[in-house]
Regions:
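A glycine-rich beta-turn/hairpin centered on an aromatic-Pro dipeptide
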Residues: 308-345
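A structural supersecondary motif
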Residues: 270-271, 341-358
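Short, well-ordered beta-strand elements within core beta-sheets of diverse protein domains
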Residues: 156, 187, 289, 369-376
């Protein structure tokens, strides 16, 4: 009998998962609250529904007699997915595991209890209590971030000489972006940032690859690009992988994809956070399959259905890099030289804005204007060519 899988969300990042699951021969039901979500048309059955409502999505799951559920590249419905798995006795993470993997405070507690390396941190709802802790218990720069949110929204770096009024302003911004209205105050780790793409099956933590990240500077740390495999020394990559594995084991998640984020300071890794899901920014859906030859989408889909994933390369590994267009803020007057993107080394490209749009300052990943993905023999060559293309496409703003 044909397996039935429910995909929670149908945005641009979920489209590759919806398409691949159908190619694998599964019946795909996709739900999204936006009737115009671009992925709905690719599913066998599209449902417009509130994917953050546990009761509504549990009703859909029962009516559709699903065999598995997946919420790729997003965190807003992780608890919903966990509840469905619990109630219908499906493969994949439980609701308790979903809560632990989306609440940064609980996540840090799990890391500390297990001995997985992570920055010193505390969680607050009251700005005055947070300010007192910052002054008394922390030294040097820190990060304020929403306790429950994904992406870079609401994150700010603060220095030791910050005034209370500015601290309070940034605290309230982070609180406004947090789904549980709690704010994390954490030690700032100075150093390069990485992500680790993982498949967990039957208790085994399988690291597929390590991703180098390029971000803006403080205060927002918006991701400008990624490359795979990592260009860092083998010993550094080994430490990063070990930290990520320890973090996943600390969370206790199973039969799912994981996307860990790690920074390295003075040669030592610190786990920033781990999502029990596929990574966004095309990392898990495009970059990882290209750089490893492993079909990570198929692996994650099969995990959700309780089917053992294939983690062997099925295509030749390549160097791969994604870079994002982030033009000068203003009204977009013209875009020129996009013909430079028509090259065999360009796997895909897209420009998100059109002439007449307002180009915002890049304060979150939602502010970026487009992307290009390049494949090459090595990641170094892919990076060089992607950077060249980013500079050759001209966005005129005023």
């Amino acid at each position: 009998m044909q397996k039935r899988i429910l995909v929670l969300a149908a945005g641009i990042l979920q489209v590759p998962v919806i398409k691949r699951a159908r190619e694998m021969g599964y019946y795909v039901i996709t739900a999204d609250g936006d009737p115009n979500a671009c992925g709905l048309k690719f599913a066998d059955k599209a449902i417009v529904a509130n994917i953050t409502s546990e009761e509504e999505m549990l009703r859909v799951a029962r009516e559709e007699k699903i065999d598995g559920v997946i919420h790729p590249c997003s965190e807003v419905s992780m608890n919903v997915m966990g509840r469905i798995n619990d109630e219908l006795h499906l493969s994949g993470i439980s609701k308790d595991q979903a809560i632990r993997a989306t609440n940064k405070h609980l996540m840090r507690e799990a890391f500390e209890a297990y001995g997985a390396p992570s920055p010193k941190s505390r969680c607050f709802t009251d700005v005055e209590v947070a300010w007192g802790a910052f002054c008394m218990d922390f030294t040097g720069a820190c990060i304020l971030k929403p306790s429950r949110n994904s992406g870079s929204r609401g994150i700010a770096k603060i220095n030791s000489n910050i005034q209370m009024d500015e601290f309070a302003r940034l605290f309230e911004i982070a609180k406004g972006e947090s789904r549980d209205k709690q704010v994390m105050l954490e030690q700032f780790i100075e150093g390069p940032e990485f992500s680790i793409e993982i498949i967990v099956w039957d208790g085994q933590v399988n690291v597929l690859t390590v991703t180098d990240k390029k971000t803006t500077e403080a205060p927002h740390f918006v991701e400008l690009g990624h490359n795979q495999p990592s260009c860092f020394p083998a010993e550094t990559v080994k430490k990063i992988k070990a930290a990520a594995v320890a973090g996943v084991k600390a969370l206790g998640v199973n039969n799912c994809a994981c996307h860990a984020e790690v920074k390295v300071q003075d040669g030592e890794p610190f786990i920033m956070e781990i999502g029990a899901r596929m990574g966004g920014d095309f990392i898990s859906t495009v970059l990882t399959p290209l750089s490893t030859g492993v079909d990570m989408i198929a692996a994650a889909v099969n995990c959700a259905l309780g089917i053992g994933p294939c983690l062997q390369p099925i295509t030749k590994p390549q160097g791969v890099c994604i870079r994002y267009f982030c033009p000068k803020p203003g009204v977009l007057k013209s875009i020129s030289n996009t013909e430079a993107l028509e090259d065999s080394r360009v796997y895909e490209w897209e420009i998100y804005h059109k002439v007449g749009d307002i180009i915002p300052e890049v304060t979150s990943s939602l502010c970026r204007s487009g992307h290009v993905i390049v494949t090459e023999e090595t990641p170094q060559k892919a990076i060089a060519y992607a950077e060249r293309l980013i500079s050759e496409v001209i966005f005129e703003t005023e």
